[in-house]
Amino acid sequence: MEFHPPLQSATLIRRYKRFLADVITPEGETLTIHCANTGAMTGCATPGDTVWYSTSDNPKRKYPNSWELTETPAGHWICVNTLRANDLVAEAIAQNAIPEFSEYKKISREVKYGEENSRIDLLLQAEQQVNCYIEVKSVTLLQENCGYFPDAVTTRGQKHLRELQHIAEQGQRAVLFFAVLHSGINQVAAAAHIDHNYSSLLEQAQNSGVEVICYQANMTGKGMVLGDKLTFLLK
């Protein structure tokens, strides 16, 4: 995934009202940019961090600039725009870059399914293969050398796990795909210390046949690509 045009950098002043952030450019101009991430963004939004932002040519947008990446003083890259995760994974599957999905040829997005009025992020289909339902989650929380999901209590995420479990119990393929969007993370676990219910539901889902797959993204101001497969820890 390439950023067109390449992202521009600025220094973070503050994030506020969840959806907004103030930054200062190298030229000294203060900008208010949009933040698509509604999560806690723990460790991803420290004042003084380098922010990389994109610019929309849509004249109707109140805030034309969007926060895409954070570069920390430690040298870590973090994608804070959670909307990028689905595109990143779909692109990798289409390019046959994820061996676990190499047998599937058709990719559909945001397909209605389940018993709780849900939409699956990615539905993969192929002749002589069961359908593969993929729910994509972004992992950006780094604590004690481990990446955790979620970074806040998520009833929506809990619903997705119930839906995936039901799909697996029907004999179809159900996958929880963790797109690791923090370069400092080298393993992933459920954040039981943040959302115990989510952690418990994930364990139940795995016991019912839901697969958990983790891949890390390589990121720069020019683009992103999925790289190494990471280990998911059962804690």
Curated annotation (Swiss-Prot):
One of its GO terms (molecular function) is DNA binding. It comes from the Bacteria. Pfam families: SfsA, SfsA_N. Gene3D superfamilies: 2.40.50.580, 3.40.1350.60. PANTHER family: SUGAR FERMENTATION STIMULATION PROTEIN A. Belongs to the SfsA family. HAMAP family: SfsA. This is Sugar fermentation stimulation protein homolog. It comes from Photorhabdus laumondii subsp. laumondii (strain DSM 15139 / CIP 105565 / TT01) (Photorhabdus luminescens subsp. laumondii).
